[in-house]
Amino acid sequence: MNVKTEPDRSRDVSQPLDKLGPDETLKANSDYLRGTIKQSLADEITAAVTANDAKLMKFFGIYQQDDRDIRDERRRQKLEAAFSFMVRVRLPGGVCSPSQWLKLDALGRAYGGDTLRLTTRQTFQLHRIMKHNMRAVIQGLRDVLLDTRAACGDDTRGVMCTVNPDLSKLHAEVYALAKQASDHAVHRTGAYQEIWYEAERQDTDGPEEPFYGRTYMPRKFKIGFAIPPSNDIDVYGQDLGFIAIARRGKLKGFNVAIGGGLGRTDQSPKTYPRLATVIGYIDADKLFPTIDAVMSVQRDYGDRLDRLHARFKYTIDEKGLDWIKAEAERRLGFALEPAQPYTFTSNGDPLGWVKGEDGREHCTLFIQNGRVINTPDHPMMDGLRAIAQVHKGMFRITPNQNLIISDIAPEDRPAIAALMKQYGLDQFETRSGLRLNSMACVALPTCGLAMAESERYLPDLVTKIEAILNVHGLKDDPITIRMTGCPNGCSRPYIAEIGLTGRAPGKYNLYLGGGFHGERLNKMYLENVGEGAILEALDKTLGHYARDRKPGEHFGDFAIRAGYVVEVKEGRFFND
């Protein structure tokens, strides 16, 4: 191997704080994330918290936001912005009980604008929480054994796990490890209990953060567990991905993939999405040492000067994959074994009913863009509450923002199915293949980074694309389409067959050629265009696809074969 022996350390944690970015000083001087958050919460003059406290609160799963629909009007009236907060739950693998669902439903109705949001990382978000209500929300979550620690911030984000109920035993094994991984990697500071539960500070015998230290990670770090043949979690988009390898239906171990990440900045060509690289295999009992070793390499060598360059993918491409692997193995004390064979067939959700190995049944419901809300013609939130009141199994959020009513005894299926029909929750049976494989981030009006609409616009755009699909006989074909309101990639648009990222109000970059299994990045086809140009381009390319595709060929593969875009073989060539 061509391994670099002396990597550049001028931008990592080995340097004095005054040589690094301001966020590193903020973290180091925050008293393990305490900052002045208590004082900010007590300040009744403003609905906001201080800028520094807003950054620290991300480590507790909380984002300060404002209603951008009325921002200009409030400015004209010389009022402060209409501040509120988004609260994200830590929910490894997306699994919650009926009692937890009912609590979240109640909190959403009382404090979150009568809605819940299912996310692309298998958890819940509550939006429009007022500052004076945040403790009530977080303490309400505690009542059902949920918290929001590390759902945002420079730490290990929510741990993902394939939702594969038809492989019940294997899923149970992998999910148990994913849940343990979430607990293993979460930060240890007592600040969360002191601020949100109003607990007394406890003395500690050792370091308050034995793994993270005072400055935590350089940037977010994402971990996910995939169970082939499903790649629903988009394992190649994770900083650290584990691909389950089974023998005779029992978990044997994991292939290890490192360096995935999909965020980028349009104005910064040095930023790009990258798919994770599989570097080897470990037995299941080596999982937690491997997590520690890989994370510690990024903790120690990640860029802490430039946050646009701070994700693990850039550390790998700068230091070299061979060096990163060798350093992780040095810390592990053993070499990874060669990767084991595996096959992915899809990164979508099989909607409808399936029966698991244990005889229990599961039904996957289509939740458009993850938005759980009542509308005059579709009382979805009421319907899911009614199911939670009688359901004896679990709820499982998928990485595609859908919802599985899981672990249903055969004798209970008729009652659950009747509620689904009563509340219109079975409408997935009439949806197009494109809509069922669509995904959008929240974007406007609450996300401060959004430059264009996403969740509020994609359903209407899909309706217009469906008219094109009908003309070309493609209505039922599964084609992935994903939209974000900015280039940061929260709905993973850069691995969709059709990707759209916001540039300005009504303007988007259009990407084509992503892999249907999540195994290939797409490539920009049109830049900064409006709806008319998007529909014209899709009419052309989808029509060509309908006429000339090969048997079993997916649209993303065709877009490359037909020459609409070139294949992106490595993330660092994405912007070429």
UniProtKB/Swiss-Prot annotation:
PANTHER family with a match to the protein in the record: SULFITE REDUCTASE [NADPH] SUBUNIT BETA (PTHR11493:SF47), SULFITE REDUCTASE [NADPH] SUBUNIT BETA-RELATED (PTHR11493)
Subunit structure of this chain's protein: Alpha(8)-beta(8). The alpha component is a flavoprotein, the beta component is a hemoprotein.
Ligand binding ([4Fe-4S] cluster): 441, 447, 486, 490
EC assignment: 1.8.1.2
Keywords noted in UniProt: 4Fe-4S, Amino-acid biosynthesis, Cysteine biosynthesis, Heme, Iron, Iron-sulfur, Metal-binding, NADP, Oxidoreductase
Main function: Component of the sulfite reductase complex that catalyzes the 6-electron reduction of sulfite to sulfide. This is one of several activities required for the biosynthesis of L-cysteine from sulfate.
Protein's recorded name: Sulfite reductase [NADPH] hemoprotein beta-component
